[in-house]
Amino acid sequence: MKYGVIDVGGGLRGIYGAGVLDRCLEEDLRFDLCIGVSAGSANMASYLAGQHGRNKPFYDEYSFRREYMSVHNLIRKHSYLDLGYVYGTLSNAGGENPLDYAALARSPAELCVVAANAQNGEAQYFTKADLHPDDYRIFMASCCIPVIDQPCVIDGVPYFDGGLADPVPLEWAFAHGCDRVALILTKPIGLVRSDARDKHLAHLLQSHYPAAAEGLRRRAWRYNTAVQRAQELERQGLVCIIAPDSTEGMSTLTKNRACLEKMYAKGKQDAEALVRWMQNAKQDESVGT
């Protein structure tokens, strides 16, 4: 039986997924295929490296620094989020909070990091083979928010946030051999995503990256359709959805320490359902054999 886990990210709301995955580390829950979109990709990296608690300060401490995200960055570097600071300065060996690359590489689990090709709008599914010591550009690509950030270029190809192309890569997980999938959302299940803001941003992006702009226009539909499908599969016992009952008033880039703490605590608490689901699935598997 192959078990997968997906963390869809969601900007600073991604601290919820960090809480879920920290609880998974505490319970020694292991997955065979780990898929991250946007901030979810960074959460997944720390989970695979076994670095409990590593991601939390990226949300509730570092994000308040001017170097991380600010109008100053937008004026000086033409990007509101300095992803080089996040995934380079802070995360490289010798940085303030380095990713344990060796531990990540040793992990037997597969890693998939989803980004959107800015030129053709298609999803790019990066793997461990695309990671190298102190070269974490695939995470930058997956987290690169269009319009407020310049695209992240890898091997001459510009990339934006993976949510533009495959915001909830559930079908990809099953197509790549998963029998059961845990899905971590950062919005309540019943909250239908609106496309109003995305359509406005798409208009601003249209002249330079028309395919990526179309991805923005379709993002809400793709997300809502995938979540609906996940609910159908959950009723069949094939998917376990972990989602907060509230966003605590947080949007993608809301910087509020109290709300961030609540979202992290919710993630750890809500992960109890995932623990039980995995235990039951493993039990059923052993009985079946």
Predicted features along the sequence, with ranges:
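Patatin-like phospholipase
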Residues: 1-37, 45-289
